[in-house]
């Protein structure tokens, strides 16, 4: 089964770092002519003295290069999500800057420009962050009755849910081991952790699940689990299989011999046992019929009873001879 390959952040650095300052993108901006990206402040400062791309030397604009620069929010969100602590550190630097320079007018800027956006509002999750989750047993019958009213739920169903606080780097494999040890589930049963009705991979982390299913922190991360028997694999003994194949071949050979003997009375030469020589029906004229390789053949001598046709066979091929 195909598995997602995890790569190191250092392998992605060439796509996440600005060539002008050597750091990760902050307020990423892209040149629409060549699609190369830089930090906004870096490219604006560079284009004050040049009208060409720093990477490929394509002309950005003849007179006003800033017109062909666009803010790349998607790229910036990717950088913030891939680099741990970058968003939180950048927001802190902006707050410190405006606190140290109160004369700077930031009223026209957004909350992110002023550094007043929290990780929760930006939906940025770090590895060391604590995530609240709920885990409950997945009942297929209850899922089929999903259209019923909420008031029909019993107190037992509400008490089935448990709440945990776990690091964002916790994997589903660790959560399955926790459930097995907590509930004493035997090893011959399989535990599946699910989001809604979809089973989750063992290598998924809570951070992966939050990003994949767009968890918005409006409550604990809802997870479910189910327990099912482990499927046993039947092992085939190669020695037994070889014996069965050999016996099948022998049966097919014997069947072909029987079919040959019934189809027209032609003696078969494929049998492993030699057939006895066929004696001449005329003991006084032994030259009429002779045996070659267990089959009958006619002699070249003249037969006194030539007026009667006889049937002979040579090497399993029948023929009618008139003598």
Curated annotation (Swiss-Prot):
Which keywords has UniProt assigned to this entry?
Chromatin regulator, Metal-binding, Nucleus, Repressor, Transcription, Transcription regulation, Zinc, Zinc-finger
The sequence motif named Nuclear localization signal is recorded at 81-95
- A GO BP term, please? negative regulation of transcription by RNA polymerase II
Gene3D superfamilies per UniProt: Phosphatidylinositol 3-kinase Catalytic Subunit, Chain A, domain 1 (3.10.20.90), Zinc/RING finger domain, C3HC4 (zinc finger) (3.30.40.10)
Q: Where are the zinc fingers (RING-type)?
A: 18-57
Q: Where in the cell is it found?
A: Nucleus
Q: Which residues cross the membrane?
A: none
Q: What assembly does the database describe for this protein?
A: Component of a PRC1-like complex. Interacts with cbx4.
Q: What is this protein called?
A: Polycomb complex protein BMI-1-B
Provide the organism lineage as a comma list.
Eukaryota, Metazoa, Chordata, Craniata, Vertebrata
